[in-house]
Amino acid sequence: MTKAIYIVFLSIAIFCMTTLAHGSKNYPDSLTQEFYDIGPSVQNAIKTANAAKLAQYFNSSVNLQVPGKSGSFGKTQAEFIIKDFFSNFPPSSFSINNQGKSSATTTYYIGTYKSGSKTFRCYYTIIVFDNKERINVLKFE
């Protein structure tokens, strides 16, 4: 009987050690609540044209597209470009039409951004990297 108990405890210990050893820093754990929570904050920053707030969630490099500008930009430069976009096209409304996961660490959002008589399709992706969510693609087309 003691051999059976020993085998059960050994199996549990091996399972726990394997689970901990193969954990990834790119995936959220139950102790960290910041994961998958920036979506509403990003949406609010876009609705209120708050470029500084939006930039808090930018990855160190952002693939950005707005009228007249397209490319990969550093976080600070991307903030200035978005601030200029919001200045030229202040939001009258913004809504998310679709969202989903394109991979275990990437969530995409597709929305409609209206500014006066202009309507833009807004697309952005949020990735989980180093235990943080970050915007790595943002497009207003």
Question: What is each model feature region?
Answer:
Residues 4, 8, 20-44:
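Short, low-complexity N-terminal intrinsically disordered segments enriched in polar/charged residues
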Residues 11-19:
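Hydrophobic h-region of N-terminal signal peptides that target proteins for export
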Residues 31-35, 47, 55, 71-75:
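Solvent-exposed, acidic/flexible segments
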Residues 34, 38, 42, 50, ...:
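Stable alpha-helical elements in mature extracytoplasmic
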Residues 50-61:
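Short, well-ordered alpha-helical segments enriched in acidic and aromatic residues
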Residues 64-71:
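A short gly/proline-enriched turn/hairpin at secondary-structure junctions
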Residues 80-119:
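Surface-exposed, charged secondary-structure patches
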Residues 119-141:
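Short beta-strand edge/turn micro-motifs at domain boundaries
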